[in-house]
Swiss-Prot record:
It holds the Pfam family O-FucT. It is a single-pass type II membrane protein. This is O-fucosyltransferase 28. It is found in: Membrane.
Length: 638
């Protein structure tokens, strides 16, 4: 007893269960200290080895009342509550402190006082159970509101996880969908595209360059090897290579990967493989012509026969003039490739082959294609449209045409000297003013800016300049004053991105080609080789808007506007009227009296490679032309 009392001053009766309950009462009245509870409850009860052997009451314990511990009241409680107190749960509750986590100490006091008296213990236990039920309901609602309640059910050997919140959301969504299904569907209207960005109506025209389904290429021995030296700038070489593919087909020749021009104005040392995806070129055309990387060893050491084909020649020329030479010498080299095949009057299969070569086989290298796509995405920031302006106001073009409008005297003299230094340029003395009035000069940057403004393009329009270095010290100032959002490959790409291409003008021209092809509007101020190639490609891709300004009438109008003869409103209205039908719409290319006067095949591949599917007679006409063309195929085999 003295040992126990030294540890804890709370008096503990040695014999009866009632003393145990009284001890708990005394403990519950002390300050809430977890260490005290542990020390008190965990002490051994002196004089009692069996907790089930005594009885207890709810009376307060005191030393003077120890003699009444064995009164009849004790036996009464022992008789009626023996089973209750002997239950393991109750024994645990009597020896432990109760705690409800969400109401703290207040709940502890309430429950503790519930056991202070042995009277009506059943009611208090019932109340405790009811409290637990209420608490469980509260937790259920609380968890449904924010905590995931996961139920696992085994269904066909799969574990299904259900979340109450998700089930509730699904139910609400199902109700909403059922209600919405009974109402008319609301369709979001697309904002109309402004007219200045709309492409022309393409009608029912479609690409028609595929081979017939029953096409089988005859396996026959080659008549020889054709080596071609493409001349000129990138786009002149590009179209020339496509013509040489067709010529190789006509003569049943094996085409060697073309050689590119390294001696023209640009002096670009790039090879065919540096600019074009040569594997794709060979793979796309493998069912049409045989293409090899190099001459076979037995022919590599031979000196080929050099020939320059006649410009705008028909298939009959190559069959009658060139094919015998090829068969005799086995290796034939063409030193020129530009415009060496007629625009019209060729078999439909040959015309379609030219288109397959240009639009499907001649892809640029992956490095060029990837950077081109990056530049397009930067121009289309937030899906904004942009104009690609082929401003052919470059030194070589101005020297060739003799145009020096708006240039200084020193700059005009520099152009004249350059024109005389190029031997194959036949025209030397040119009246610049007269050439401009005739519409033979490219627009100056100022004229191009005024033209775009008159056509309705706002100053906020993004403009990409498709050209090399613009000639003239102050030529671009007037353009930037009207259109400040102007870019080129040198300002749009980083130095690191341009580093592999910066020293190669043809590779930079390939980048410009991609950006121009993908533009929302393409405007070209002069009918150069790039303008022809890009506008034809855009027609082939679905008649994307390509504006060809009426330069002849524009020169007259802008001079009148500068002189104050007409107002801006009159000037703008007339510019729009004159160029209303010059936006790249569908129309068929027609032959002319002289090949030089014809529209270039690659500037407008319709109707040969773009067909009207709603007109079966056009397809029947092409079928008859294929039948008529069998004769030249037989001659090529002989």
């Amino acid at each position: 007893m003295s040992v126990v009392g030294a540890i804890n001053p709370v008096p503990i009766a040695p014999t009866t269960r009632r003393r145990v309950g009284d001890s708990l009462d005394v403990i519950s009245e002390r300050p809430s200290n977890s260490s005290d509870y542990c020390n008190t409850i965990n002490q051994p009860i002196v004089g009692s080895t069996d907790l089930d052997g005594g009885d207890a009451t709810g009376q307060d314990s005191s030393p003077s009342s120890e003699s009444s511990a064995s009164s009849t009241g004790s036996h009464y409680h022992h008789d009626h509550y023996h089973r209750f107190y002997s239950h393991p749960v109750i024994r645990y509750l009597l020896l432990r402190k109760f705690w409800i986590p969400f109401y703290g100490g207040a709940s502890t006091v309430v429950i503790g006082q519930g056991f202070r008296s042995g009277r009506n213990v059943g009611r208090r236990i019932l109340g405790l159970l009811m409290l637990l039920v209420v608490a469980s309901v509260f937790l259920r609602v609380y968890l449904m509101g924010g905590v995931r309640v996961v139920d696992h059910a085994r269904l066909k050997e799969f574990v299904v996880v259900r979340t109450l919140r998700d089930d509730w959301s699904m139910a609400q969504r199902e109700v909403a969908e059922n209600q919405a299904s009974s109402q008319p569907m609301r369709v979001l209207e697309k904002l109309p595209i402004p007219e200045i960005w709309q492409k022309p109506e393409s009608g029912n025209y479609r690409q028609c360059v595929t081979r017939p389904k029953n096409y089988t290429r005859l396996q026959r021995q080659t008549n020889g090897y054709l080596v071609v030296h493409a001349n000129g700038g990138l786009n002149q070489m590009r179209t020339g290579i496509c013509d040489m593919v067709a010529v190789a087909k006509i003569m049943n020749a094996t085409l060697v990967l073309p050689l590119l021009d390294h001696e023209s104005f640009w002096t670009d040392p790039s090879t065919f493989k540096d600019i074009f995806d040569w594997r794709n070129f060979m793979n796309v055309l493998k069912h049409d012509v045989d293409i090899v990387e190099y001459l076979p060893p037995q022919y590599a050491a031979m000196k080929p026969l050099l020939k320059a084909p006649v410009s705008w020649s028909k298939a009959s020329y190559y069959r009658s003039e060139m094919l015998p030479l090829l068969k005799r010498h086995k290796v034939l080299k063409f030193t020129l490739t530009d415009s060496r095949l007629a625009n019209n009057g060729l078999p439909p299969s040959i015309q379609r082959l030219r288109c397959r070569a240009n639009y499907q086989a001649l892809l640029y290298t992956k490095e060029i294609e990837d950077l081109g796509k990056i530049l397009v995405n930067r121009l289309r920031n937030n899906t904004e449209p942009y104009i690609a302006l082929h401003l052919r106001y470059e030194k070589d073009m101005l020297a060739f045409t003799g145009c020096n409008h708006n240039l200084t005297t020193e700059e005009a003299e520099e152009l004249r000297i350059m024109r005389y230094s190029v031997k194959h340029w036949k025209e030397k003395e040119i009246d610049s003013r007269e050439r401009r009035i005739q519409g033979g000069c490219p627009m100056s940057p100022r004229e191009a800016a005024i033209f775009l403004k008159a056509m309705g393009y706002p100053s906020s329009t993004t403009v990409y300049i498709v050209a090399g270095e613009i000639y003239g010290s102050e030529s671009m100032d007037a353009f930037r004053a009207e259109y400040p959002n102007v870019f080129s490959h040198s300002t749009l790409a980083t130095e690191e991105e341009l580093e592999p291409f910066s020293q190669y003008q043809n590779r930079l021209a390939a980048l410009d080609y991609i950006v121009a092809l993908e533009s929302d509007v393409f405007v070209y101020t002069y009918d150069g080789n790039m303008a022809k190639a890009v506008q034809g490609h855009r027609k082939f891709e679905g008649f994307r808007k390509s504006i060809n300004p009426d330069r002849l009438n524009f020169v007259r109008l802008i001079d009148h506007f500068d002189e104050g003869i007409i107002s801006w409103e009159e000037f703008s209205s007339e510019v729009k009227r004159l160029n209303r039908d010059r936006i790249g719409a569908a129309y068929g290319r027609l032959p002319a009296a002289l090949p030089r006067l014809e529209e270039n095949f690659y500037a407008n591949p319709q109707p040969d490679c773009i067909c009207n599917k709603s007109h079966p007679e056009q397809l029947r006409k092409q079928s008859s032309l294929r039948t008529d063309s069998k004769s030249w195929k037989k001659s090529a085999l002989r």
